[in-house]
Design a protein with these regions (language model features):
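Central antiparallel beta-sheet cores of small beta-barrel/beta-sandwich binding domains
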Residues: 1-78, 86-106
C-alpha cells in the first residue's frame, strides 16, 4: 500500500481555502481515508470508495454530504514524503488542485 500516514495539502475551493489534513491507513488490506477538516467544515462528511493503486498513484471516488448523490473523483501521485493531485467534480465540470501535499507523520 502506498501513501500511508498523515498528510496536509492546500486547497482552494468555493467553500474553503486553506489546508486540510488527510489520514491514509490500511484497514484489513483496504484503504481507509479520513479527512480532518477545519472547524468551519465540521459538519461535512466525506466517504471514499473504489480506491485503486497504480504505481505511485491512488485514484478513487467519493461523496461529500454537501453534494448528496454527486460523485467526486480524485487522483493523487506520491513522491516520497510529498504529493500532488486533483479533485474533480464532474457534474460542475470543475477541477481542484491539491497542492504542496506533504507527510506530517507515518
Amino acid at each position: 500500500m502506498i501513501g500511508l500516514g498523515t498528510w496536509v495539502t492546500s486547497v482552494n475551493m468555493m467553500i474553503f481555502k486553506g489546508d486540510i489534513t488527510v489520514v491514509i491507513a490500511d484497514k484489513d488490506g483496504q484503504y481507509d481515508i479520513d479527512f480532518q477538516l477545519p472547524d468551519k467544515l465540521k459538519d461535512v462528511k466525506i466517504r471514499t470508495y473504489d480506491i485503486v493503486e497504480n504505481g505511485n498513484t491512488l485514484k478513487g471516488k467519493g461523496e461529500i454530504t454537501m453534494l448528496p448523490g454527486k460523485e467526486l473523483e480524485a487522483e493523487v501521485t506520491f513522491n516520497g514524503d510529498k504529493f500532488e493531485g486533483v479533485l474533480r467534480i464532474p457534474f460542475m465540470k470543475r477541477t481542484i488542485e491539491l497542492k504542496n501535499g506533504h507527510r506530517i507523520s507515518d
